[in-house]
């Protein structure tokens, strides 16, 4: 830090509120999402936005009986700092053909829509696809067709694949 500049805060530090999600809760939420999607389908393929969309896409595809799964790899976070969007891997030609080039009959799945930047980019690639997320924040929610839980914009979701169980000493031993 030079010349009295404030340190750059991570997205997590700016968010302030924590929303930890266990594996059990995440699986229940994905199944609830599937119940809603079952009324919308059928779908020819599931497109997972990686990496966060991989786990929910696997659960949703299994529950809906969809065998074709593809990914679109977009990097926007470096650990916990959001940066410029970078398409690392586009949607396969085979999946694009299944969706008629516009995404019709395709299901895009992600864990969360936050600011909507990633969602907007994928929507441009597949404008007629159905976009589903497990969680949604207000800024990104308008881009999503189906979601399960809305959280405030200032909430940081701790997904089970990003966390680990750890020992905490009892309060009487000075734990906060």
From Swiss-Prot:
Catalysed reactions, semicolon-separated: GMP + diphosphate = guanine + 5-phospho-alpha-D-ribose 1-diphosphate; XMP + diphosphate = xanthine + 5-phospho-alpha-D-ribose 1-diphosphate; IMP + diphosphate = hypoxanthine + 5-phospho-alpha-D-ribose 1-diphosphate
Chain positions recorded as 5-phospho-alpha-D-ribose 1-diphosphate binding sites: 51-52, 110-118
Tree of life domain: Bacteria
CDD domains recorded: PRTases_typeI
Membrane topology annotation: Peripheral membrane protein
E.C. number(s) listed in UniProt: 2.4.2.-, 2.4.2.22
Positions that bind guanine: 114, 157
Residues bound to GMP: 114-118, 156-157
Signal peptide: none
InterPro entries recorded: PRibTrfase_dom, PRTase-like, Xanthine_Guanine_PRibTrfase
Residues where Mg(2+) binds: 111
Binding-site list for xanthine: 114, 157
Enzyme class, UniProt record, top EC level: transferase
Similarity comment: family membership: Belongs to the purine/pyrimidine phosphoribosyltransferase family. XGPT subfamily.
PANTHER family given in the database record: XANTHINE PHOSPHORIBOSYLTRANSFERASE (PTHR39563), XANTHINE-GUANINE PHOSPHORIBOSYLTRANSFERASE (PTHR39563:SF1)
Name used for this protein in its record: Xanthine-guanine phosphoribosyltransferase
Annotated source species: Bradyrhizobium diazoefficiens (strain JCM 10833 / BCRC 13528 / IAM 13628 / NBRC 14792 / USDA 110)
Organism taxonomic ancestry: Bacteria, Pseudomonadati, Pseudomonadota, Alphaproteobacteria, Hyphomicrobiales
């Amino acid at each position: 830090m030079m010349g009295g500049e404030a340190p750059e805060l991570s997205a997590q530090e700016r968010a302030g509120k924590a929303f930890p999600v266990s594996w059990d809760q995440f699986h229940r939420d994905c199944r609830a999402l599937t119940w809603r999607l079952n009324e919308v389908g059928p779908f020819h393929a599931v497109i997972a936005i990686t990496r966060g969309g991989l786990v929910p896409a696997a659960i949703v595809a299994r529950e809906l009986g969809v065998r074709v799964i593809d990914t679109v790899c977009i990097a926007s976070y470096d650990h916990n700092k959001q940066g410029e969007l970078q398409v690392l891997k586009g949607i396969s030609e085979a999946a694009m053909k299944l969706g008629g080039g516009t995404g019709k009959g395709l299901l895009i799945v992600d864990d969360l829509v936050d600011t909507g930047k990633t969602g907007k980019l994928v929507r441009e690639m597949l404008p007629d696809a159905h976009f589903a997320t497990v969680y949604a924040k207000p800024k990104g929610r308008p881009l999503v067709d189906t979601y399960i839980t809305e959280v405030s914009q200032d909430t940081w979701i701790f997904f089970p694949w990003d966390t680990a169980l750890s020992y905490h000493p009892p309060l009487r031993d000075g734990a906060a």
